[in-house]
Amino acid sequence: MIILGLDTATPTASAALVEDGKLVAEKLYDKSKEARQNSPVQARGNHAEIVVPLIQSVLDQGHISLSALSGLAVSIGPGSFTGLRIALATVKGIAYDWGLPVVGVSTLHANAARVKNHEGVIGSLLDARKREVYFAIFHRQGQTLTPVSEERVCSIEAAIESLRSAGETSPLVIGDGAIAYEPLLAKAFGGAAQICAGDEFGSLAAAVAALSWRRFADHASDDLASLVPLYLRSSEAENKRAAHIN
C-alpha cells in the first residue's frame, strides 16, 4: 500500500511517499529560505505555486506514478489558513481525477508522531504567531501515540502551564513553536526541556502519510465534501469584519 502525504500547514511544505508504513521518498520546501539551485522545486514565493511541483518531485524521486497510489493523506490543520486550503484543494482534485480515497490528519498529531524513541508525554507546538501556539499534549507508549489534551490555540505561557500540569519536569516538545519559544521553555523548566527535531520522520508529510496507513488498511477514508481545514481560530479578515459590525 503506497500513500502520498502532503502538508502545507507550516512554512515548510512537504510531500512524502510511505509504503506499508515505511518512508520511500520525501521532499521539503521552506518558503522562508531560497530553494537550493539543484532542487527540482524552485523558489516561487508561496505554497500555491510550489505544491504541484513538490508532489511531482516526490513521485519522481520514488519512481511512483499517481496510478500506483493506494490513497492520499493530507494535514488538515491547525496551521496556515492559506496553506491548509491549498493542500486540501490539491488533494481533493487529485482524488476526484484518479478515484483515490483521502484521509485527513491533524497537523499537531502528525507533529507529535515524528518522535518515536521517547516514552511518555510529548508536547506538540506549532507557531501561531502573536506569541501564541497551536498546542496539544500526546502520550507515547510503545507504538501507540494517544492524545491526552484537546487541540487549541493559546499563549506560550498557557502551553507551558499545561505541560507542568501534566507532571512534566523535563518535557519533550516538538515543532516550530517549540523552536520559536525555546528560550521561554528552557527558562520555565530550568533548562530541562527537550527540544526535539523528530527522530522518526523528517517531514510532517511523512508522518501524515504514516498515521493514515491504519485507516486505509481498514478500508476507511474521509468524505471529500465534508473534509475541511481545522483552523482553531478566526482569520484576520473574519476578525476585522466582526470588529466592523460591532
Regions inferred by a protein language model and the residue ranges of each:
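N-terminal beta-alpha supersecondary unit
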Residues: 1-76
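Surface "functional belts" at beta-alpha junctions
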Residues: 22, 30-36, 40-43, 101-202, ...
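Stable alpha-helical structural segments in soluble proteins, enriched in small hydrophobic residues
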Residues: 58-62, 97, 115, 208-216
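Generic secondary-structure signature for well-ordered alpha-helical cores
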Residues: 60, 64, 143, 165, ...
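Phosphate-handling active-site elements
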Residues: 60-68, 95-105, 220
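DPxDG-like acidic metal-binding loop motif
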Residues: 73-102
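Acyltransferase
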Residues: 194-246
